[in-house]
Amino acid sequence: MTTQQQATGAPRTPRFYLALAVGKAAAAVLKLARRRGGQVPGTVAEAICPDFLARIPKPERVVFVTGTNGKTTTSNLLDDILIESGLDLVTNRAGGNIITGIESSLIKGSTVSGAPKNSVACMELDELSCRRVLPHMTPDILLAVNLYRDNFTRNANPDYIFSVIDASVPASTHLVLNADDLISCRLAPQAHRRTYFSIDRLPDDLEGPEGIVCDLTACPECGGHLEYDWCHLRHLGHAHCTSCGFTNPEPDYLVTHVDKRALEFTVREVCHARDGKAPEYTYRIGAYSITNLYNLVAALVTARELGIAAEELQRILASGKVNVTATRFSETSAREMRLVNSASKGENSTATSTALATICGEPGRKAVVLMLADYYLATNPKKTEYTGWYYQADFEHLAGDDVKQVVVQGANSDDLLLRLLLAGVDPARIKLAETETDAADLIDLEGIDGVFCAYDIFNGEQADRFRDRVTQRIEQA
C-alpha cells in the first residue's frame, strides 16, 4: 500500500460510514459514562464493516512500536517526546494495542467523514496483531524493542512471534531495531531501510546471559555455538558464532557512556558522521536502570529518525516532562520509608526476573510484596493462569539477606510459595495474604528501609491500594 493509498484508505462505502458513525457514538457514550472501554468503538465498527481498518483514512505518517518487553513504556515515552516537540499526534494510549484498539483510536482521531484530524499516528502494536494490522496500515517506521519468551499460553515461544512479525512487515517500512538483541535485529530482511541502536559495554555487564533460562543459546543462522562477549540484560548484549561468524549488526546510534549518579548518558550518532567524526549528544534519564535506558534510547532513536533534532530532544528530556510512566514505576515515601511499586508483566519470566533484580539491587533492608497473579483473570471461573512460568523466573533474587520479608498475594499464592521455597527463600520470611489490604497489614515495618511491590500490569489499582494502606499504617504509628 502506497502512502497515498494509506492516507485515503480503500473506497469508503455506506457500510463504512455506518460503522464510523456507530463507533463514534460508542466512544461518546463511553466518555459520558466515564468508562474507558478502549476497544469498544473499534469492535462495533468492525462488526458492521469487517474491513474497517482498510477503509478508514490514515494520518500522513504512521509509527508503530512492538516487541515483547517495554513496548508500552517505550511507546508512551515516544508519544510524550513527539508531543513536546510539537507534532500533531494520535496515539492508542486510551485504546489498546490490538486491531480493535487501533481502530478505536483512529475513530476518535477522525472527523465525521473519516478524515484524520492528526498528521502523525504513533501507536503500540501487539506482536501477534502485526498480521492483522500491517496489511491495512503500513507504518513509515516500525520500532521493535526486543523479543523474549512471553505468556506461554498465548505467545508460545520467541521463534513463533518472530515468524509472525517477520512475515508481516512491508518492504517499504523503515525498521528501527535493537542491535543488542540477536533475535529481533534479524527481523524482516525484505525491509531494506534499517536503523540499529546499541549500548556499548558497561562496567557492570555480565560475561553471559543472566538468569536460569536463556532465549538464545545457539546461533540463529546456523545453529552453531554462540559465544557471548558481554550481556547487559538477559540475552541482550554482544555475541558471535564460533562456526559461521554471525554477530551483532553495526549500530547507527551507540550509547558510549552512562553516568548513573548524574543520571545522564551519551549517544554517538555513527550514521551522522562527517569526515570520520560522529556527533555525540548527552541526555538526561529520570530514573536509571538498564531497562529504562533501553526504552528511552529506543524512543530517542525513533524520534531522531522522524527528524527531531538532537538538541530539541536534549531540551525535552532536561525539562523533566518526559519520564517512565507512573503506571510502570512509581515511588513515594512515608516518614523516610521508601514505598516503591514496580510493574511486572504477569506470565512473563523475563519481565518478572528483571523487576526482581532491580528491586533486590536497591540499597537497604526491604520487604517485598508479590502481586503477580492476574486479578481479573482470577475472577473468571472458566479460566486459569499457567503457573509453569514461575520456574523460568529468577525468584532466587529474593533469597538475599537484605530481603527481610516476602509477602505473596493473589489467587496462586500456594504455587508461588512452593517456587519461593525451591529458590531458597527462608520460609520464616514468607507470608501469604488474601487481599492487598491483608498484604499491607502483614508487613513488619520494623527494621526495614523500604517496601517494594512487584505487581502484574493488570493489578495497578490493587498495588495502589496496597501502598495507600502501608502509608496509612506508617503515618498512624
Give short role names for the model-derived ranges:
Residues 110-115, 273, 362-363, 395-398:
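Alpha-helix termini
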Residues 95, 126, 180, 288, ...:
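Short beta->alpha junction loops/turns
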Residues 2-31, 36-38, 216, 223, ...:
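ATP-dependent carboxylate-amine ligase
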Residues 60, 122, 148-336, 418-421:
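Acidic, Mg2+-coordinating active-site environments of NTP-dependent enzymes
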Residues 78, 82, 102-106, 296-306, ...:
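Buried hydrophobic packing segments
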Residues 4-218:
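Phosphate-binding loop of NTP-binding sites
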